Amino acid sequence: MKLAKLIPKRFFIRSKDRSTVSKSPTAFSFGSASSSSGQDCKNSGGDGGGGSVTPTSILPEVPSPYSYVEILQAFKLIDRDNDGAVSRHDLESLLSRLGPDPLTEEEINVMLKEVDCDGDGTIRLEELASRVVSLDPARDSTELKETFEFFDADRDGLISADELLRVFSTIGDERCTLDDCKRMIADVDEDGDGFVCFTEFSRMMDLQR
């Protein structure tokens, strides 16, 4: 069970600097809300219609913080009906599991437009991969902090095994148990308090890369 692969920071992180919408504290984005997202979509390879996800074996090798296998895993987490395209319904379903605050139609539109290169109203694997490749590596430390805050549900500066399990359950990983989460914490828990602080969380993410 690879934590970094299961929850890629740049796919599910909330965007605090989105200029268009920022109402919901649980509004998650696939990446930064740059107005140049259309340029990021060049050569994305989306076919604009129905069909299956492009096999990872034929996707090009490009510099990216994540492998295409990791991107595919993230894509499958969102594409709940497994039809090869992330629809508005898929996105709304994910966000409803990640937080209690309902998103407005405008917020959903912004999140789709950030990644939907061909404008067909859905997100395909190639479009998501193109978005990830274009992200700025300098944002990594900020996004790591935001990822920590997402796990830390009670905002006490520590992540418990229960909080870790909540995230796995939310995104649909039925295999992860509380004991699994306790073992993951024990691997980086330097002070032995049974919790993970931000420094220890950083080590946890490094170990999962």
From Swiss-Prot:
SUPFAM superfamilies given in the database record: EF-hand
Chain sites annotated for binding Ca(2+) 1: 79, 81, 83, 90
Top-rank taxon: Eukaryota
GO MF terms, alphabetically ordered: calcium ion binding
EF-hand domain location: 66-101, 103-138, 139-174, 176-209
Residues annotated to bind Ca(2+) 3: 189, 191, 193, 200
InterPro entries in the cross-refs: EF-hand-dom_pair, EF_Hand_1_Ca_BS, EF_hand_dom, EF_hand_pair_protein_CML-like
Biased composition (Low complexity): 27-38
Region Disordered, annotated ranges: 22-59
Residues the record lists as binding Ca(2+) 2: 152, 154, 156, 163
One annotated GO biological process: defense response to fungus
Alphabetic keyword roster: Calcium, Metal-binding, Repeat
Task of the protein: Potential calcium sensor.
Descriptive protein name: Probable calcium-binding protein CML36
